[in-house]
């Protein structure tokens, strides 16, 4: 692991890749808080079908985020990937870009199909983990993170902006 300072940071990373379900949501919230990324939990169990989060990155419009985690090595399918679109429409975020975080991964047929939508991307946990690590290191700004996430299709580590010195 790269320059991860302290046991708490290492635990964040380990939990991010290991946990599923509600525990995964909690570690996701902890990481956002640690990185000082503003978010609002929308799915508080009082609103039927609400998306999970509204993420507010610096100098960027809000993003509606849905977390989909699967047990073992199962992949998030098309239907689960696009649920966030309906949830965002119903709950008043019809103009917001939507992201489905697929943990551990997304079915490979999904990104090409959803790219035409123009308002949705999927990101696998390993790719988002790399991006968040770069935010922590200061080599990726929140605005750059937004631009990377808000590109229709799939947000891949290979597409992250690199820092020139």
What are these model-predicted stretches?
Residues 1-10:
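Feature for intrinsically disordered/low-complexity regulatory segments and propeptides
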Residues 11-165:
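Catalytic core segments in nucleotide and nucleic-acid processing enzymes
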């Amino acid at each position: 692991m790269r320059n991860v300072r302290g046991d708490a940071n290492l635990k964040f990373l380990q939990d991010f890749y290991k946990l599923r379900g509600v525990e995964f949501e909690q570690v996701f919230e902890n990481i956002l808080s640690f990185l000082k990324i503003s978010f609002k939990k929308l799915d508080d169990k009082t609103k039927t079908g609400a998306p999970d989060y509204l993420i507010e990155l610096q100098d960027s419009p809000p993003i509606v985020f849905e977390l989909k985690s699967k047990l073992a090595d199962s992949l998030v399918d098309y239907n689960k990937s696009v649920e966030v679109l309906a949830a965002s429409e119903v709950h008043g975020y019809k103009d917001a870009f939507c992201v489905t975080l697929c943990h551990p991964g997304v079915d490979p047929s999904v990104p090409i199909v959803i790219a035409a939508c123009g308002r949705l991307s999927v990101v696998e946990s390993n790719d988002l983990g790399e991006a968040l690590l770069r935010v922590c290191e200061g080599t990726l700004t929140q605005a750059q993170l937004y631009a990377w996430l808000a590109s229709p299709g799939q947000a891949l580590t290979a597409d992250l902006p690199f820092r020139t010195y």
